[in-house]
Amino acid sequence: MRKEELRTYIENHESEMIEDLKSLIRIPSEKQAAEPGKPFGAPAAEALAQGIEILEKYGFAVTNYDNYAIAADFNQEEKGLDILAHLDVVPAGEGWQETDPFIPLIKEGKMFGRGTADDKGPAIAAIYAMRAVKELGYPLKKNVRLVLGSDEECGSSCLLYTSPSPRDGLLSRMPSSA
């Protein structure tokens, strides 16, 4: 029953999901020189700001860790599931054949653009999973925390700033690391 309900929910929100992903792909969030308040450069900070906008649009309270990373909690429980994803991308370089790397394109049912698989697409999938659970009213006994970093491609130093001490989550992984 819930599986079918979730499938229907995702199908009904597919166009929103695609637009949210496109909004992230358009940001060339390659690591750049630090600026005041933007430790990994302006594009990385812009990607985090877009992540905040998306999460807040769906009713999640978001903590911004000084533009190193952001985190959204499903509820106020202390321990639970941590989902880690990132909004930075490796430099575009050569080899793109379908589209400009930062202009999203859907062709034959597939989306092309920098970050669709690593890791903006999985980040959007995680946001929509949390949104579906919330909007469908599924009760959770523990918290789910989504942490979106901005420096994974260059060492993940962004995650050092997400909490004064490491959380005791039951599982921490990136959605793209299945």
Regions found by a protein language model. Give the residues of each.
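Hydrophobic alpha-helical segments, chiefly the membrane-spanning helices
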Residues: S172-A178
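Gly/Ser-rich oxyanion-binding loop with an adjacent helix/lid
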Residues: R145-L159
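Short acidic, glycine/proline-rich loop/turn micro-motifs
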Residues: A34-G37, T116, C158
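N-terminal helical capping/dimerization or prosegment-like subdomains
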Residues: M1-A85, V89-G93
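Conserved small/polar residues in nucleotide/adenosyl-binding loops
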Residues: Y161-P166
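Glycine/Thr-rich phosphate-binding loops of Rossmann-like dinucleotide-binding domains
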Residues: P91-G93, S157, S172
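Active-site metal-coordination/substrate-binding segment of hydrolases
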Residues: G80-L148
